[in-house]
């Protein structure tokens, strides 16, 4: 019997995001919160560059449900604070970025850095520590090349570390490439994806749909990991992806 959509794997283009993941930087198994593509409109055509999946520690579900249970998927999608609560919540997160089109590490890190710095400056929190963290971040990516199917993994600890890992074929790496101890950077990387100016509205909507269903059915993250879960509305979309 297949898993209900709110805890099932998600396919974005030809890339599958498993229902659970255990990345470098944590001893815990995380559940898939949602996934979607990132792209841009170029000459009237939507061009997809990456597929993005956001995973959450099991404790994230009851933690978020205290405030957000009872809200519809539409309400969650439109709520800036809901996504801030995911970004800043006291639980571990994993963000996986898989390339649909080839990209150099320099191209990727420069764009992420630009978004992070813009967020910090708008919040009045850009200082020497953040500047040095960005330098380290760019150094980690400086000699990387990402062909289609290659993945970047960011494990974000609530204690402030950002663990960065790479995989050329999309499988989960066993060893981290770098760890940067800077909580604002760890949060800003995820903020740049699902925040108010996040680069993947598809991933945001997928998160809202799946989490609202988990809240509604009183499902905890541990049940999602073990498969002891049933979701009332099994017709909900697994994500918003183009065929």
From Swiss-Prot:
Annotated site (Important for catalytic activity): 108
GO molecular function ontology, one term from the record: chalcone isomerase activity
Top-level EC class as recorded in UniProt: isomerase
InterPro entries: CFI, Chalcone_isomerase, Chalcone_isomerase_3-sand, Chalcone_isomerase_bundle_sf, Chalcone_isomerase_sf
UniProt EC number: 5.5.1.6
Pathway recorded for this protein: Secondary metabolite biosynthesis; flavonoid biosynthesis
Keyword field contains Isomerase: yes
Signal peptide region: none
Catalytic activity: a chalcone = a flavanone
Binding annotation for substrate: 50, 115, 192
Gene Ontology process terms (BP): flavonoid biosynthetic process
Known function: Catalyzes the intramolecular cyclization of bicyclic chalcones into tricyclic (S)-flavanones. Responsible for the isomerization of 4,2',4',6'-tetrahydroxychalcone (also termed chalcone) into naringenin.
PANTHER family linked: CHALCONE--FLAVANONE ISOMERASE 1-RELATED, CHALCONE--FLAVONONE ISOMERASE 1-RELATED
Miscellaneous comment text of the record: Part of the biosynthetic pathway for all classes of flavonoids, a large class of secondary plant metabolites, many of which are brightly colored.
This protein's name: Chalcone--flavanone isomerase
């Amino acid at each position: 019997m297949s898993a209900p959509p709110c805890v099932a794997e998600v396919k974005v283009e030809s890339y599958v995001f498993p229902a659970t993941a255990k990345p470098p930087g944590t001893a815990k198994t995380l559940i898939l919160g949602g996934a979607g593509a990132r792209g841009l409109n170029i000459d009237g055509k939507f061009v997809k560059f990456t597929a993005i999946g956001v995973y959450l520690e099991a404790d994230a579900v009851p933690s978020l449900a205290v405030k957000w249970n009872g809200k519809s998927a539409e309400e969650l999608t439109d709520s800036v604070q809901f996504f801030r609560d995911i970004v800043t919540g006291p639980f571990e997160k994993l963000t996986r970025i898989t390339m649909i089109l080839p990209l150099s590490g320099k191209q990727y890190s420069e764009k992420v850095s630009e978004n992070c710095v813009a967020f910090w400056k708008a919040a009045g929190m850009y200082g020497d520590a953040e500047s040095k963290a960005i330098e380290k971040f760019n150094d980690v990516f400086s000699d990387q090349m990402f062909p289609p199917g290659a993945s970047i993994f960011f494990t974000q600890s609530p204690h402030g570390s950002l663990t960065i890992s790479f995989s050329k074929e999309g499988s989960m790496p066993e060893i981290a490439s770098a760890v940067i101890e800077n909580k604002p950077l760890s949060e800003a990387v995820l903020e740049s994806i699902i925040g108010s100016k996040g680069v993947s509205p598809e991933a945001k909507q997928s998160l809202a749909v799946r989490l609202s269903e988990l809240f509604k059915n009183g499902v905890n993250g541990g049940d999602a990991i073990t498969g002891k879960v049933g979701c009332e509305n099994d017709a909900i979309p697994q994500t918003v992806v183009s065929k």
